[in-house]
């Protein structure tokens, strides 16, 4: 199977790969003239590309006409995740990309145990993890990780951009299947779904009320208690299954 790389430098039947990926292809993989790879432009379009030349830190290609990526789901999913301790957020990002998430937005809430520290530096690492996961699993877009929102109020103020907001709460709520069936996307657009899950301490009752007032639909996650790094992935898996994106 051809190796996959992301580049935005694709036009008029040619393409250029630069930086670390160019080094990987030319020095690590020992690519040769005439070898074929798959290039992705980050907007769900892929190209079959043939190596035509090497520069100091570049690889040049001729490319065939682009075609839609088969790996992209029919829904646009954003994970809003209560900021967890240690490397749990890295796990959520890595596996969330594999499952089809497009956006990740960490946030701090009342019962978060983790405290803000070196967030810009961490954000660079998180986006790199998303980038590598997207390459590994064959995604046609580059999922992004935002800087964390400072409190749950900021989360609620950001929710009007979505067609469906799922607030995951231990007190339960409406069936997920029903909520997905009732949600309607804008004409010609993917259904935009936001999934909100808590950190280790869960949510305060006031935060659940804030989410409901902001239009979020409360959903339960079954009779078992899920860890904060398990819950978001469980919901994403359920959403992808119910929308036909894991078939």
Give each language-model segment a name.
Residues 25, 89-92, 207:
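Hydrophobic side chains in well-ordered alpha-helices
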Residues 15-17, 74-78, 190-194, 212-221:
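Glycine/charged-rich beta-loop-alpha catalytic/anionic-binding loops adjacent to active sites
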Residues 1-68:
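N-terminal positively charged helical leader segments and presequences
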Residues 13, 33-35, 45-47, 57-59, ...:
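A generic structural signal for short beta-strands and their flanking turns/coil linkers
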Residues 70-167:
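RNA substrate-binding interface of SAM-dependent RNA methyltransferases
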Residues 205-247:
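Structured adenosyl-cofactor binding patch, chiefly the S-adenosyl-L-methionine
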Residues 162-208, 216-220:
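Active-site/ligand-binding-proximal alpha/beta "capping" segment
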